Amino acid sequence: MHSNVKKVTDKDVIKPVGVPFVVYFSSISNNTHRFIQKLEIENLRIPYEIEQSISVDRDYVLVTPTYSGGGEYVEGAVPKQVIKFLNNKQNRSFCRGVISSGNTNFGDTFGIAGPIISKKLNVPFLYQFELLGTQHDVSQIKQILFKFWEDGNNERK
């Protein structure tokens, strides 16, 4: 795991309510898109075209790939489209957690977009997976998301 991950305590976490919902970005390779489809969870895709935008008005977990060159090079790790989406105060306010993907060939910067966003937004970094992910990753993430929402719904009753 990454050394710069901020520990988020339970008192810091605002758990989501409603039903599990994922907002994600996928490049033209569609790796993240194909992974999200396997989750079979309601979702919304951040547009690839930087001029386009979306707005979110409900709790969500962000899933993003990592763009990074490995080693100490983390500049540009968070895709520009994700930065633009999160620069919208309303979109940012509904983010409850983050999941990232990456390539283990890049060593310490594998999935580093997740910890960067987690630290910036003070939300939990929930999981990371490699490239297209595995069936195990799909199962783990579904379990994490449903538990996260269940806890949030129970706390607000």
Swiss-Prot record:
GO BP: protein modification process
Transmembrane feature ranges: none
InterPro entries noted in UniProt: Flavoprotein-like_sf, RNR_Ib_NrdI_bac, RNR_NrdI
Organism superkingdom: Bacteria
Molecular-function GO terms, alphabetical: FMN binding
Signal peptide: none
Free-text function comment from the UniProt entry: Probably involved in ribonucleotide reductase function.
Assigned protein family: Belongs to the NrdI family.
Protein name: Protein NrdI
